[in-house]
Regions:
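Long, charge-rich, low-complexity alpha-helical segments
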Residues: 221-260, 304-372
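A short glycine-rich, Lys/Arg-flanked "PGG" loop and its adjoining helix->strand segment in the class I
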Residues: 101-113
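Conserved alpha-helix/loop element of class I SAM-dependent methyltransferases that forms part
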Residues: 1-15, 30, 34
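A short SAM/SAH-binding and catalytic strip from SAM-dependent methyltransferases
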Residues: 86-100
Length: 372
């Protein structure tokens, strides 16, 4: 809602959704259950080429009584056959395709003119060490069965040289969480990671544009450069160059999570107005408000990097009411502030909280419980 519909979608209206590369159904079930809880008239489609994964997803849907899902055993390259879609969810899939850029184009062709998609692709720098070992294991265990590959890989990892890049990468631990995680990370057919600039090019080739990063603060190099004289040198760079610089400086981005819309889509990011409905995301609003009141700041730690921002008590009073149940105008009135002063506070909060995936605009939960 926030990234594609500006936080203003009327959820009483029908919506058509595709989960592309749905696997065993994690994203599918979450989306379908939320829409069912909200009584949204939804038509949901699932696409995945693996019959075994589809069976698991179907069983999960049946268990929850989610009967508004259409299952298709096919590639996402055929997505347009079932569209057009108002929203496409595709997480952790495109980088596994032989031609990921073609996958971008296939999904773009399946979008409705006013629709958009949520995407996740692997990033290279935060996954340092993964690709070296993928190459190493490809040479070492290519002739073995999957089970034998895991046995050999475990032996290698137990004695992995401390100089290996993966040994010093604290952000990647999939290989420590069971055989499935190990196989998917290091023994799976090699994935193709995306830098910021490769994402830029893939979107352009698919007639798409970026609607927003899930955590835009991680793509702002000025938040990583504390020296003002150096920080000013960022100003002459293009948006994409700045984002690429931040990715390179931080070195800890494992995945890129973002939303995209068609170039012709006139969508604009939501801003505070009296009718907008802000909702704190990824943390209880009252907990964040209490932290602000006690410390006079908000701090977020993301993969080893801590970002802090000073705030005052007035901000705490505003955050406390950002539950998705009240409009911005109602929140400002509840905090006993005039609109001009409240708007200034809200705009500052929106920038900082939004930078780290903690504030969204949406009417989805206005009259509903937020749990799945």
């Amino acid at each position: 809602d926030h990234f594609i519909f500006g936080g203003c979608r009327d959820w009483r209206k029908p919506i058509k959704i595709l989960v592309a590369g749905g696997g065993t159904g994690d994203a599918l079930i979450m989306i379908a259950q939320l829409l069912k809880n909200r009584a949204v008239p939804a038509e949901i489609h699932y696409i995945d080429p693996a019959k075994a994964s589809r069976k698991i997803a179907e069983d999960r849907a049946h268990f929850r009584g989610l009967d508004h899902i259409n299952f298709h055993t096919t590639s996402l390259e055929n997505a347009a056959d079932f569209g057009p879609f108002d929203y496409i969810d595709c997480c952790g899939v495109l980088h596994h395709l032989p031609d990921p850029e073609y996958g971008f184009r296939a999904l773009s062709n399946a979008l409705a003119p006013s629709g958009g998609m949520g995407l996740m692709v692997y990033a290279p720098y935060g996954r340092r060490g993964v690709y070296e070992l993928q190459n190493a294991f490809s040479a070492l265990v290519a002739d073995l069965s999957p089970r034998e590959k895991v046995v050999v890989a475990k032996k290698v990892l137990r004695n992995l040289p401390k100089t290996a890049a993966l040994a010093s990468n604290p952000w990647v631990a999939d290989h420590k969480n069971g055989d499935a995680g190990l196989y998917d990370l290091l023994l799976h057919s090699r994935d193709q990671p995306f830098t910021v600039e490769r994402i830029r090019d893939a979107l352009a080739q698919a007639d798409l544009r970026l609607a927003g990063w899930v955590e835009p603060g991680r793509y702002d190099p000025k938040l990583l450069i504390n020296d003002q004289s150096v920080s000013q040198r960022v100003d002459h760079l293009s948006y994409w160059k700045r984002a690429a610089l931040a990715e390179q400086l931080a070195g800890n981005i494992k995945t890129h999570r973002f939303y995209a819309v068609l170039n012709a889509n006139t969508f604009a990011p939501p801003v505070f107005c009296p009718e907008s409905v802000p909702v704190i995301h990824n943390a209880p609003a009252d907990k964040l408000a209490k932290s602000i009141a006690q410390t006079g700041k908000l701090s977020f730690t993301v993969n080893g990097l801590t970002f802090s921002h000073k705030l005052d008590r007035a901000s705490a009073d505003l955050v406390r009411h950002m539950t998705g149940k009240m409009t911005a105008g109602e929140i400002v009135a509840k905090a006993n502030l005039n609109w001009e002063f409240g708007l200034k506070r809200l705009s500052g909060l929106s920038l900082y909280l939004g930078n780290f995936n903690h504030l969204r605009f949406s009417r989805f939960f206005a009259d509903q419980d937020q749990t799945v």
